[in-house]
Every structure is written in C-alpha cells, then in structure tokens.
C-alpha cells in the first residue's frame, strides 16, 4: 500500500508546493548555507554533528522513533525538515520552538497517534498525512499559521467541526488521508472543509468505496481522489459522496487515480458528471472489470470540455467493442485523450462531432482508423503516436474528411511510403510529426501542400529529391537522425527558417544551402561525421561568420571525424593552407620555385663557375674516402715521399713557382727527378724506384707533356703500379687543355687515362687557387714513417 501511495502524494505535492520549494532552495545558494541529505542512511537517532547553519535537512526513510528538542534546537536557521517514512509515534511540536524560521515540515508516513501542539509563525507546508491519528490532528494553534499553503492530514473518524480552528485560513492544498476511515453502515458523517483551492482524498487500497461523509468546500477548484474501487452495487455511494462536492460552480478539474470499476458503473459516473460544472475530467490507471455491454447514455449539454484517460486495463477480453468505442466517439466535448490502452480502433462519430482535439497515443490502432470518416469537421489536432500505423498513403486519405485539421502527430509508428501515386491530404494541415518511422526519400512525394512545421527525424531518409513538390510554406524542418550526406537546398523550401539536421552522415556539406536559404534563422547541424579536408573550408568560413543564435550548438557539436589526425578537433580550430587546397596555385608555386632555381644555378654556373667547384669538392671527398679504406701500415711501409712529380721541362717554371711552394710548406715531401734521382742509375730504374717510394704520383699535363717521351715512360710505370698495387695513386693536373688529336696514337695509355680518369684542372682565376691547393694537399697528405737508423 505504501508503494501505491508514494507516487500519488508526490504528484500532488508537486502540483501544490513546487513553487514554494523552488523559491526556498534558490535562497540557499550562498556558500555559507547548507542542504543536508541523510535519507535512506539507516538512522536510528538524529546525528549530533549537523552543521549549525543547515537550512535544508532530509532524514526521510530511516528508523527514527523519537525527536527531542536537543536534536535540532541548535539549527536556528532551519527552513525545510523532511522526516517522512520513519517510526515516529509521539510528537511534541514544541521541539521546534527554537526553529522559528521553519517553513516546510513533512511528517507523513510515520506511526503518529498523538501530537502536542505549539504555535508556529512562518510554517507554509505541514504534512501529517498517512499516520495513525484517530481524529484530525488540528490544534487551535494552527489558526495562527496565516502563511500556511499546504496541509496534509490523516484520520479514521471525521467530525463536522474538526477543521474549525483553521476555518479562516485560505489554503491552496489539503491532502486528506482516509485509508483508515471507517463508519458503521447507514451512518453518515459531515465535514466542512472551508477554504481551499485543491482537495486530494486518498482512500484505502483494495476496499470498495463506502465513505459516507457530507463534505462541503468553499472555493474548491480542483478535486483529486485516489484508490477508488467500485462495482454496480456501491457505485451509488461515490455519486452521493460527490453530490455535495460538485455543487459549487468553481469545481473545474476532477481527477481519479487508481480506479477499478465495472463498465456499467463507469458509464453512470460519466452520466453523473455530464451535468456538473466540471470542465476537465482526468482518470489515471483505470481497470475495467466484468462485461462490457451497451449502456444507455444521454449526451446532453455539458460543461465538460476535456476527458483524459491514461492507462486502461481490462480483465475481460470478449465483449462488445462497439459498445466501448461508441461511448467515447459520440461524446459532445472538445477534447478527448485515451492513451496507453489496448484499444484497437475508434469509431467515426455518427453525426457532426464537436471534437477539436483527439489524443490516442500508445494504443493499437491500424490504418483503418477513421477511414471514410466525414464527421470530424471541427477536429484541429489529432495525435496517433505509438500505434500500429503502416501505410502513409491511407493516412493521407483519412485526413480528407477533416477540413479543420492543423496538427497531426504520427510519430513512433511503422509508416512507409513506396507508391508512385500522388498522396491526397487535407489542405489545412500546418504541423506534421512523422518522426521515428520507416520512411525513406519517397516521403517527400507524399506531404501536405501547406505544411509549415515538418518533423521527420529518426527515419531512413538518405537524400531529399530535387524534383519533389514545392513546399513553399514550410518554415521548420527536423530531419535529424537520418542518413543524409549533405545539407538540403531551399529550392523547394523557399520559406524555410529552421533546420534541424544533426546526427546524419554529412561529411563535407556544401555552401549552396547557406546561399539558397536566405531566410534561415536557426540551423542545428552538429554531431555529423565531418571530413576535415579542403572541401570543408568554405563551409567552416561561412558558418563561423553566422550568429551563435542562428547556428545552434556551435562550436562544441561540430567536430572533425576524419582524417584520424584531426578526429575530435572542433571545426573552428581546423586550419589548412590555401596552397594545399589549390592545384593551380600549387602548380604556379612549384613552377616559380623551379624557375628561380634554374636562374640561380645558371647564374652560378656562368659567373661563379659552380661546376668546377663541385668537381673539386667531389674529388676531395672521393680521395678522403679511398684513403680511409686503405690500411695505414700498408701505405707507410715503403713510402718516403708524399708525391712524385712528373712534368715537362717547359712547365718547370710553374712547378717551381706554384706547385712546390704551395705543397712543401706543410712538411709534405715532394720527389723531383732533378734533385732526388740517384746518380749512376738508369733513368728507368730511378723512375720505377721513386714512384714506388711515393704515396701519389702527380702528373702535370699540358701539350708539352705529350711531346716528352720520358714523361710518357713515367706515366706508363705509374699506371702499371696502379694496377699492381691495387690502389689509386695517380693524380692528373691539367695545366693547359690537351686536344685529343694532339696526342700521338702510340700514347694510348695517356689517351685512356685522360678519357676515363678524373683530373684536377688548374684554374686561371686566382680566387680559385686556394681551394685547388687544399684539394691537392688533402689528396697526398699521409704521415710517413721515420727512416730506421
């Protein structure tokens, strides 16, 4: 029973005191004020270490059995105290005498039997309901609670003057728990509930309604009753009970929670209320027992505007469906809401209907609903979400007989459209919700012509065909959670101002949408897998320049999904150079760079002789590499000279004035035939001997060298030594150019060497001499072993 009552009371409290609680909590936002939640913590006594500045204290759903002054006296600033669902049996309200700021006190769902009173001043909410009081716990001190807004009470007996101490108060809500109420048969009690706007009566669960109390309430505008169990016999008691409560013209809203009744009794209750001033009748959790047969009902003039029934359960399954549906379809009211029921159909009214609003959410209706129905001429809103609708074409035909229909909700069905035929819709529809269906691109060939708000989110749409019927009046389009790959243009939606297209497959949206949709005031396109490439730059530039009021969720919902290096990057933080994105610009840049390079190389070659410098550096590098690859011991074992010089006598002046001074100044030993050849030995023997004792053989080539026979011999033996010793010991210096035709045919060795080997060319420019000598010295530089004594 507790489980049943908790949501009921919470709902009622929400209606009655939400403003009070919110307003109070807002005042507790300062850092030095506290809200303590100790609910469901197994407390058996009030903790002693509560912060003295506590403003809100929740100790509900614990095991507290008593409350003493010392428990809360130090909480002088306490404003809200919740002690519901505990084990309190006795309570002296004087425990709160030091809590003068207390405004909200909830003592419901305890075991209170007795209560001692104490005056309060600021109390606005007092809940003593769902306790074990025999009579209503009303103290005379309650008469001073001029700010009291909500009062919750419990009693097993009622007396007419129980509420006299608070007769002068103007309450907003009274919750009266009558779960333990009992009166002997044929006895009637009276209770005058003077001034309250809302009255909530909670009866015992499982017991047939038998309360016989004459209640009268002044200014009652809202009546709510919970746990009503009726059968054909005691149905009269409910109507008798309501007779006094429904007399006043101010009762406009009547709600029944957890109602179990027979069909016959339900019809009688409807007939009873049909002539009362009640305008809004709500029934939540209705259970129909026994058979459903045709019952006579008079649809006389009524003040009732709206009937809402939410969640119907039937205990019988074989009955007259027409009797059930006819009762509701013929009602002469403006608004009918029957939701969460096993209804599979609803009949078309036989005569012109007064319905302006119909809500049949979460039933089992099929495509045959209101088929060929022409009596719903005043219907403006029709809600058919969460049913079994499948064929959109048939639904369009259904609306043909509803000339006033403006709002149609078909969401959460299984609608498809795969016909080539043109759909027929009533022309009055302005708002159409077809979200969460199975619709594809073809749906754009089956839309009402004057629709202004269209919701197609969560379908199977991949694109918007360009040849669809023009929807010139469409202002809002929600097409989120589909599979679109690009933003739609406004060619067919010239009045579009709001577009919701997030959660699609848009990777590189075009800017045509922005250009063609000049009336856009709101666009939501985040949560798409954007590919951050060159194609996206223009879109980012355009959308980032738009107002944040227009581009919703920018920039947080707009992130790169590809490539991996940019995944998760906000679009506003994605940057790529113009050069990377423009082929023509890249071509021009590369061409210009190559042109500058060619001009530079040409200048260096012509004016600075760059090739000569390159050859010299290359030769020096190769020489150093070869020298590192030859074992030092092998080079040093017989060497006495760094170089053997071979030259023509006509070139001796250059050798003595240029070559020797630049080589021998760094302890380099040069072998010259005129100073080192051994007298008495043959010239050939001296040549061979000193070539073998030299690390390198330097030949100064010129036209004079070609004409010298001894120079040729020296070259021959040096070349022979090259192959014999298996390392490179020849260095050719071209002092002057030697034309090939000037070399005698019998000097084939010289011809082949000049043709095949790299030589050092003596530069005419003096600025190049330094590099020449450095290169030559590096080629012959080696540490010679000292002669053994």
UniProtKB/Swiss-Prot annotation:
Disulphide bond pairs: 117-139, 235-265, 348-373, 423-446
Primary location: membrane
Gene3D superfamilies associated with the record: Ribonuclease Inhibitor, Toll/interleukin-1 receptor homology (TIR) domain
Ranges of the LRR repeats in the UniProt entry: 54-77, 78-101, 102-122, 123-147, 148-168, 169-196, 197-219, 220-250, 251-277, 278-303, 304-330, 331-354, 355-378, 379-404, 405-428, 429-449, 450-473, 474-495, 496-519
PROSITE patterns tied to this protein: LRR, TIR
SUPFAM superfamilies noted in UniProt: L domain-like (SSF52058), Toll/Interleukin receptor TIR domain (SSF52200)
Domain LRRCT stretches: 520-575
Highest taxon of the lineage: Eukaryota
Domain TIR: 639-780
GO molecular function, one term: NAD+ nucleosidase activity, cyclic ADP-ribose generating
Xref: Pfam families: LRR_8, TIR
UniProt-annotated glycosylation sites, renumbered to this chain: 144, 186, 214, 253, 285, 372, 433, 519
Cytoplasmic-side segments: 609-789
Family stated for the protein in its record: Belongs to the Toll-like receptor family.
Name of the protein described by the UniProt record: Toll-like receptor 6
Species assigned in the record: Dasypus novemcinctus
Gene from which this protein is expressed: TLR6
């Amino acid at each position: 029973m507790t489980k049943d009552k908790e949501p009921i009371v919470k709902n009622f409290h929400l209606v009655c005191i939400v403003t009070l609680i919110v307003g109070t909590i807002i005042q507790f936002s300062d850092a030095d004020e506290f809200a303590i939640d100790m609910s469901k913590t197994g407390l058996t006594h009030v903790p002693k270490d509560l912060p003295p500045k506590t403003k809100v204290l929740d100790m509900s759903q614990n095991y507290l059995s008593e409350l003493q002054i010392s428990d809360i006296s130090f909480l002088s600033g306490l404003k809200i105290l919740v002690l519901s669902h505990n084990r309190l049996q006795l309570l002296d309200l004087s425990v709160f005498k030091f809590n003068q700021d207390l405004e909200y006190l909830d003592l419901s769902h305890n075991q209170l039997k007795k209560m001692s009173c104490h005056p309060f001043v600021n109390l606005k909410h007092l809940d003593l309901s769902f306790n074990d009081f025999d009579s209503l716990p009303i103290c005379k001190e309650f008469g001073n609670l001029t700010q009291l807004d909500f009062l919750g009470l419990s009693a097993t007996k009622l007396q007419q003057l129980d509420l006299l101490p608070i007769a002068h108060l103007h309450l907003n809500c009274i919750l009266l728990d009558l779960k333990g109420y009992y009166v002997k048969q044929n006895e009637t009690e009276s209770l005058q509930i003077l001034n309250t706007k809302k009255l909530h009566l909670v009866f015992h669960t499982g017991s047939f309604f038998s309360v016989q109390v004459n209640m009268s309430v002044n200014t009652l505008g809202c009546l709510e009753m919970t746990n009503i169990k009726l059968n054909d016999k005691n149905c009269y008691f409910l109507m008798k009970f309501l007779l006094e409560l429904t007399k006043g013209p101010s009762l406009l809203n009547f709600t029944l929670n957890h109602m179990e009744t027979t069909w016959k009794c339900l019809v009688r209750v409807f007939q009873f209320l049909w002539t009362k001033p009640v305008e809004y009748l709500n029934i939540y959790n209705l259970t129909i027992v026994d058979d459903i047969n045709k019952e006579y009902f008079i649809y006389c003039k009524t003040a009732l505007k709206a009937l809402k029934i939410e969640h119907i359960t039937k205990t019988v399954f074989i009955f007259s469906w027409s009797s059930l549906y006819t009762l509701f379809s013929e009602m002469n009211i403006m608004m009918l809401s029957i939701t969460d029921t096993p209804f599979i159909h609803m009949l078309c009214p036989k005569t012109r209907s007064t319905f302006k609003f119909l809500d049949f959410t979460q039933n089992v209706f099929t495509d045959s609903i209101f088929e060929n129905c022409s009596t719903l001429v005043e219907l403006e809103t029709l809600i058919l979400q969460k049913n079994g609708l499948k064929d959109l074409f048939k639904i369009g035909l259904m609306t043909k007989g509803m000339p006033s229909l403006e709002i149609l909700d078909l969401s959460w069905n299984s609608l498809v459209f795969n016909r080539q035929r043109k759909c027929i819709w009533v022309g009055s529809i302005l708002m159409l919700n077809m979200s969460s269906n199975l619709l594809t691109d073809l749906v754009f060939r089956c839309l009402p012509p004057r629709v202004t708000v269209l919701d197609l989110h969560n379908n199977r749409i991949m694109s918007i065909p360009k040849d669809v019927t023009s929807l010139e009046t469409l202002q809002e389009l929600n097409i989120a959670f589909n599979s679109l790959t690009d933003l739609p243009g406004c060619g067919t939606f010239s009045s579009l101002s709001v577009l919701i297209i997030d959660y699609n497959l848009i990777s590189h949206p075009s800017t045509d949408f922005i250009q063609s949709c000049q009336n856009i005031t709101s666009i939501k396109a985040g949560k798409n897998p954007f590919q951050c490439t060159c194609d996206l730059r223009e879109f980012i530039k355009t959308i980032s320049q738009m107002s944040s009021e227009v581009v919703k969720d920018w920039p947080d919902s707009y992130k790169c999904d590809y490539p991996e290096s940019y995944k998760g990057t906000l679009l506003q933080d994605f940057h790529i150079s113009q050069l990377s994105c423009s082929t023509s610009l890249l071509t021009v840049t590369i061409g210009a760079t190559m042109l500058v390079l060619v001009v530079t190389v040409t200048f260096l070659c012509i004016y600075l002789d760059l090739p000569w410098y390159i050859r010299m550096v290359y030769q020096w590098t190769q020489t150093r590499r070869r020298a590192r690859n030859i074992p030092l011991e092998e080079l040093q074992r017989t060497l006495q000279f760094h170089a053997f010089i071979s030259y023509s006598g006509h070139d001796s002046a250059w050798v003595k004035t240029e070559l020797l001074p630049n080589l021998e100044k760094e302890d380099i030993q040069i072998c010259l035939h005129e100073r080192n050849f051994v007298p008495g030995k043959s010239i050939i023997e001296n040549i061979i001997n000193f070539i073998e004792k030299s690390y390198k053989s330097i030949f100064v080539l010129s036209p004079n060298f070609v004409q010298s026979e001894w120079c040729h011999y020296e070259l021959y033996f040096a070349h022979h030594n090259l192959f014999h010793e298996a390392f490179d010991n020849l260095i050719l210096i071209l002092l002057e150019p030697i034309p090939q035709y000037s070399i005698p045919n019998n000097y084939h060795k010289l011809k082949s060497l000049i043709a095949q080997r790299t030589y050092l060319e003596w530069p005419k420019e003096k600025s190049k001499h330094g590099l020449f000598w450095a290169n030559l010295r590096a080629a012959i530089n080696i540490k010679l072993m000292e002669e053994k004594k």
